[in-house]
């Protein structure tokens, strides 16, 4: 409150100042002959603008006309009590972002058709294509029960029924065996791991081979709410719900209907290597699609999937109620959860899948605090601003229960006190349309919400609690201190009201106690440059009388008359010189004037000191406050990395790893359509094909005939080879080889015998005949003549036979002979005949025809005896 005097107060002060200072000025003028000069103090208010007592001023209180005040002696301190806190168990449930994961079995038959070219040194695959076909139910049962299948597949393609046999053989039972894999979530069983790519043995021919492989894939599938489709681990998307319709035989939703779908009850799927008797019977869906079949366990949505999942549970949580919200905190996490005051209606009906789990978790948490706390009412459910659900079970301390029971003489120590609020089993019904994140809304928009708001809320709650605690203590201490200060000022005002009121107002004022109130008026500032202090403190004309404070001279602002007074405390000028005392010996005095301190010894000025050279006595009491404790924020994972990885129905990592591993480990030859062109393996066939194409229809006929012949011989050779591959044919081949070896050995032995003794081999009994009596062998000359005669006889018979055959063939000349004779005649005519003419045969023997050419020595002219030809010069 500002204090200001009226015009009358100012006028009175001026009059009083003029009357008092007029006589003093005359005395000051009379003292100008004193040997001690005066000292003019320095007043620089700008050096310390925070100190309002530096300027020289004149203060005087008027008994009337000033402002009057009184001190308040009755004060009430404000109430700083905090909000109500309730202990309890808190279970926090979050939205389940992990899709529904279940096991499926995929069945298919893979037909691979491979065309191989048989080259001279290398073989080449010129074409290869693979098709996948669905497996019917009767064969799927063989796969699920016994891990067997048929090695053939019969399909209807373009209106034609085609049958493919594995290894181009016949239909037989094949056994499934585990295949190599990379990921543990996918297991394959197959019947034929190798591609049939063996060419025929006929060179420069093409062969088509067929491979049929039965494959069963055990893997997982995923479906996300609203469960309109699901995706397998290998990337197949099935546009239907995986769940069974309530009281139905089909899935809940079917966006694209398969070729057929059946519900199989009490269907057993055995494990590999385990008998059918140990399989568990279950209800399964079986669907046939375009190129594969699929089966999975049929369950309802309510029994298999839940929209909420437990995140964290706390047995020592605190609930704080504010004006429009509830705050839940726990020491285990640095987060505070804010919820409306209203409870969630029909939570146990909306989320039946977790309600039983909620009761079990509450019982587990109760066991942790059963020695100190008891339940206080039933569980309540609240929904946070981050789409989390808090199941709250209030607790009460056992000591409070016992005290309350003794107070009201209750026999049951576990009864809840009537003053403690309990929860009624009946909850207020709310509009279910306002409840977001329900289990049957069909929307999957309730996903992960950032928990940063919860952490900020926790930090704010901790800061608010700490600050409110400090402010509460300060408020109470401040209130008590102010009350005590009022009492102290009231008592001090009776002694020196001016000092008390100046301290209270924070600026120089003049005060006077008039009864039970204090009259306050302002001070008047003087001309600061006109103020000077006397160095002599003795009263003139009186040797034993001295001033208690130095005498000063000053002028009022805009005034020319000089006034005298005494230097008061804190630069105040007293408008009188009546403050005197009996002079004392060996005394010192220090007085502050302006910004300096004057030292007087024996009432005479000695020196000037700076205010900073004199130490100060601190009477301030330091307020010791406990600062707000540090809070280290920790990242709270609402959803773990595993949950985030599983939140997508497409497991891209597993799909690509499995696909790459499966394609890179196929046992067989790779597809290579341009192999023959790039490497020149069948250039001859290509050239021959171009020639036949140029021939047109004739070329096609030749190619067809040649292809038929080659195919016939190829089939014969392949049949022979296939026969030898058969066990019976192989045994027969081994027997024939052994028989041939024996025959060759016998023939070689007989040949050596004939070479060593030909007569004995021809006539085995010749040796016995030579031993008979009367047998005499002929001479060697006779034997030689006989052999020569036999040789000539044999040669003559052979010559006669050849002559007879020539006579028979003479009139039957072939086309080749006619062409040869014609060509020979043309050549002879072009060369002029060479002077030769054909010899005529007159029926004589061969020797007679050439008799004129015989020489005297028995030879023939121009005849090469060894070669048997004549040099005719042609």
From Swiss-Prot:
Virion surface-side stretches of the chain, per the record, are: 26-727
Q: What family name appears in the similarity comment?
A: Belongs to the herpesviridae glycoprotein B family.
Q: Where is this motif: Internalization motif?
A: 836-839
What role is this protein assigned?
Answer: Envelope glycoprotein that forms spikes at the surface of virion envelope. Essential for the initial attachment to heparan sulfate moieties of the host cell surface proteoglycans. Involved in fusion of viral and cellular membranes leading to virus entry into the host cell. Following initial binding to its host receptors, membrane fusion is mediated by the fusion machinery composed at least of gB and the heterodimer gH/gL. May be involved in the fusion between the virion envelope and the outer nuclear membrane during virion egress.
Oligomeric form and interacting partners: Homotrimer; disulfide-linked. Binds to heparan sulfate proteoglycans. Interacts with gH/gL heterodimer.
Q: What's this protein's name?
A: Envelope glycoprotein B
Show which residues sit on the Intravirion side of the membrane: 749-874
Region (Involved in fusion and/or binding to host membrane) location: 116-122, 200-208
Name the Gene Ontology biological process terms. symbiont entry into host cell; virion attachment to host cell
Give the keywords, sorted. Answer: Disulfide bond, Glycoprotein, Host cell membrane, Host endosome, Host Golgi apparatus, Host membrane, Host-virus interaction, Membrane, Signal, Transmembrane, Transmembrane helix, Viral attachment to host cell, Viral envelope protein, Virion, Virus entry into host cell
Q: Does the keyword Zinc apply?
A: no
Q: How is it modified after translation?
A: A proteolytic cleavage by host furin generates two subunits that remain linked by disulfide bonds.
User: Which residue ranges does UniProt annotate as crossing the membrane?
Assistant: 728-748
Q: Where is the signal peptide?
A: 1-25
Q: List localization entries.
A: Virion membrane; Host cell membrane; Host endosome membrane; Host Golgi apparatus membrane
UniProt cross-references to Pfam families, sorted A to Z: Glycoprot_B_PH1, Glycoprot_B_PH2, Glycoprotein_B
Give the start-end ranges of region Disordered: 412-450, 830-874
- Name the gene: gB
Top-rank taxon, per record: Viruses
Q: Which GO terms describe its cellular component?
A: host cell endosome membrane; host cell Golgi membrane; host cell plasma membrane; membrane; viral envelope; virion membrane
Q: Where is this site: Cleavage?
A: 427-428
- State the membrane topology: Single-pass type I membrane protein
Would I find Signal among this entry's keywords?
yes
Glycosylation sites per record = 171, 247, 281, 302, 323, 348, 356, 376, 409, 412, 444, 558, 610, 624
| Region span, Hydrophobic membrane proximal region | 673-725
Q: List the disulfide bonds.
A: 59-523, 77-479, 149-214, 306-353, 546-583
